[in-house]
Amino acid sequence: MTSLKVLIAGAGIGGPAAAFWLSRIGCEVTVVERSPRLRATGQQVDLSGQGIVVTRMMGIEDDLRAVRCPERGMRFVDHQGVTKAFFPVDYSGKAVYSPTQEVEVMRGDLVRILYDATKTLRGVKYVFDCHIKHFSQDDAPSGGKVHVALSDGTQDSYDILIGADGIASATREMMLGTSFPDLHRDLGVYMAYFTAPSQKDDTFDWSVCHISGGKAIMTRRDQPENIRVYLATRVGFDVLDAAKTLADQKAALISLFKGTQGWQVERFLNNLENSPEADDLYCQRMSQIRLPKGAWSKGRAVLLGDAAFCPGAIGGGVGTTAALIGAYVLAGEIEKEWEGCGRKTEEFNAQNATKEYERIVRPFITSRSDMSTWMVRLWLPESNFGVKTIQTIAGFAAGSQMSKYRGNSKPADETQKLEYPDYFGLGPKP
């Protein structure tokens, strides 16, 4: 019996998740990763709602819960560390506002779990230190191939090419062409992330301190010995963009935050300058990827995850969940089209599957990534009055919410309904 040949670019989250589902329908899947090894790094990510349902169907939910970060919730503090509002972790899915989701894990742990769940599956092969150089496609809508040249010198033909290679996707550029309009939507925020040694009184909360002048300092703690520090700013982009080396980036951040009235700002700037843990510093301008309708795919090439729909780290925190949902639906629609043509490669029409995948998943993305610049200005206010306003509103909201949901500490119902087609017969039974 023939099988579909699928090439996936990117071994992060969406790529391996798609490989998992495609393996179930007998596809021959090759995952190429530009890095010479698995990139099991990154900051804390969250899973919620349908993302948890998908991991449950994959059989990896227990593995994820075993490495869940012990974060208790989000805490707003003033420059002296006094708590102004606290939003506990939401186990019920009913809270008005809870940035800390039921399942919060480090990105590296999720990447490793997905890789371990797929690396020995029948028909799945990983190739590291390898990327797509270029590809071309046959014109025929059915039965044609996408012809790919890889950086290791090999050339092959596939029935489908999936670009799951992130926000700076090379696959996307090759698919759409260099003349396609710029897809990055700048959110007007610069974020820096680094690790610092923890202290005895550091809590396992997501602590947020707003600083006048359009800045904020945040911390999250996923392990006893370290704390993760986040610096956010709406100013100083020229200095930060000009900083190319690690030393220059540290100096630029120190100059921007030194002397500000931020909670423990002196401690964290000292860590940034002198602690070896802070050498993992990563800086980025926050942006979204928002492709126009119909642009998630072209012919037999299709985009997945941040390559197609990056909502941004401050765009609702749904990127990881979206990638898992997208991988599930894409593979499911491929399976449906494959069965519909009698599993005959000469009659398989990838475009039917990829267009339906976009139709089903796009509403989820659109509803959760419509963040405009005024919302960013609200989150990072310029004035002391703006900072106090945020703290007051947060305190009122937290007080109302806590009185309504206090004590709700049980995980979400394990029979939570699958809101997408049950392609593989693994969804919760009524």
Curated annotation (Swiss-Prot):
According to the record, how does the cofactor bind? Binds 1 FAD per subunit.
What biotechnological or industrial uses does this protein have?
Eupenifeldin is a bistropolone-humulene meroterpenoid first discovered as an antitumor and anti-leukemia agent. This metabolite also shows anthelmintic activity against the parasitic worm Hemonchus contortus, anti-malarial activity as well as antifungal activity.
Q: Which InterPro entries match?
A: FAD-bd (IPR002938), FAD/NAD-bd_sf (IPR036188), FAD_aromatic-hydroxylase (IPR051704)
Q: What is its EC number?
A: 1.14.-.-
- Give the source's domain of life in one word: Eukaryota
Mutant lacking the gene: phenotype: Abolishes the production of eupenifeldin.
Q: Report whether Flavoprotein shows up as a keyword of the record.
A: yes
Q: Per the UniProt entry, what are the Gene Ontology biological process annotations, in alphabetical order?
A: terpenoid biosynthetic process
Instruction: Write out the entry's keywords from A to Z.
Output: FAD, Flavoprotein, NADP, Nucleotide-binding, Oxidoreductase
Record-linked Pfam families? FAD_binding_3
Gene Ontology MF annotations: FAD binding; oxidoreductase activity
Pathway named in the protein's UniProt entry: Secondary metabolite biosynthesis; terpenoid biosynthesis
Q: What does this protein do?
A: Flavin-dependent monooxygenase; part of the gene cluster that mediates the biosynthesis of eupenifeldin, a bistropolone meroterpenoid that acts as an antitumor agent. The first step of eupenifeldin biosynthesis is the biosynthesis of 3-methylorcinaldehyde performed by the non-reducing polyketide synthase eupA. Oxidative dearomatization of 3-methylorcinaldehyde likely catalyzed by the FAD-dependent monooxygenase eupB is followed by oxidative ring expansion by the 2-oxoglutarate-dependent dioxygenase eupC to provide the first tropolone metabolite, tropolone stipitaldehyde.
So what family is this one in? Belongs to the aromatic-ring hydroxylase family.
- Per the record, what about its domains? Consists of an N-terminal FAD-binding domain with a Rossman fold, a substrate-binding domain and a C-terminal helix that bridges the 2 domains close to the antibiotic-binding site. This last helix is flexible and may contribute to their different substrate specificities.
What is this protein identified as? Flavin-dependent monooxygenase eupH
* Gene from which the chain derives: eupH
